[in-house]
Every structure is written in structure tokens, then in C-alpha cells.
Amino acid sequence: MTDPTTPSAWGIQLSKLWMATGQPFPVDVKQLALEVTKTRFPDPIGIVTPHGIPGIDGMLSKRKTKGDWCISYDETVTVPGRINFTLGHEFGHYLVHRQTRKEFRCGQSDLLDYNSVASMKMESEANRFASFLLMPANDFRKQIERQVISIDLLGHCAERYGTSFTATALKWLEITAEAAILIVARDDFVCWSYPSKLASRKAAYLPPGTPVPRSAIDRLGGAAQHSRNECRRVGPGVWHSTMEAEEAAI
């Protein structure tokens, strides 16, 4: 079997391998990493284990005594699916980047910082590998075809793939033909945003530090009065200068 040359190609190949064995989702990254690397590489991943280091979601490090590699992760993370994506991320570093250094330390800001100028190319590539491995596009499309996208539908996909809601929403944005944008905010200001391809062409992007529209803040403040799946149509000037939008918030 020829080794792929890009993160997405690696993810696609190993995702197909997982599905070909008849195994269900979510992909067991630990099992796959251990089995694949020991049969294909002289310096395999020898162990996947918790590390107990606060603030470090995941690490990939070479073990000097054994000459193999270790993936370790923060077992105290409570966000559903985040550990699984972290393992996929570190597996991506192994496949694509292990020739460049002997240790990778990754925190949550590295895993999600898609639009920061300071975000390293390698982190983006590791994220891309994990996305293609854990959430194959063809299967994802089957889960959402002929359905209206909603918070609960994306939540179903997140549960199926063992990924966080955020990672799942980002995957949908990568494959959708709709103009859509994910916005993550804290304390009434945008932390980061990620647009779909069509939304990007329409200049639908909010940079970090942008104030969240007052109407959205008021809506979240009254969260008990609306359903998670309730979409509200808002006019131009709220999320885009000239376009209306359908807004869903959690």
C-alpha cells in the first residue's frame, strides 16, 4: 500500500481501511494507530496513554530507549469527543510531521485556531487529517442529506463520530454548499469564526474581538424560552452588512 503524501489523503486512506474491516463509528484511533504503524513503519507508535499534564490536550513524543513514539493525552478533558479528536490530531502529526521534530505539544488553542496568522501550518494539517479520518465526507453527507441542518442534527453527527460539536460543525462547513459561518464568542466578543466556502466568497467573516450583535446576546440570555433547534431570521447588518441570515445559538 502506497503511503499518501497529504494529510487529507492519509485521513481518507485510513478511514476507508477502518470501514473496510466492518468496524462501526466512531473510529478507535488508539487501535488504528497502534495496528497500522507497527506493520508499516520501523518507528511505530508503541503506546497511547494519559499523561496528566494540565493544559496540554495531547502530545506526540519519541521514546529514546525504544525508538518508537508515544501519543499521550489529558484524560481529565470532559468535553465530549475532544479526546478522540486530540488522538487523531497527534496521529496526524506522527504520519505527516514526525521527521521534523521529536516532540509535539498541543493545547486547545492550537486545535481550534483556524484563522489566526500565528497558527502553525503543521497544526492545521494535523487537524485536517483528524477531520478526514474521523468524519469521512461521504458518510457525513449521508447523515445530513435531505434534512435541514440544526443543532440536534450536528449533535447526532458528533455522537456518531465521537467528535466535539465544534469539530463536527467545522466539518459540515467544509463540505456544505450553503453560505454558513460558525462563530465562537466569549464575554460578548467573537473569539474566532470559520466560514464555509460560499460564505467566505461573500465576505462573511468576523475577526476576533468583534462585538457580538446585541440581539444574539439577548437571545442567549433568554435561552430557556427557545429551542436548541429554533432558527431565527435576522436582517442585513446583524451578521453580514448586506445579507439576511438564519441564526441558531447555543
Segments (PLM) and residue ranges:
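Active-site hotspot residues in diverse enzymes, especially metal/ion-binding acidic/histidine motifs
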Residues: M1-I250
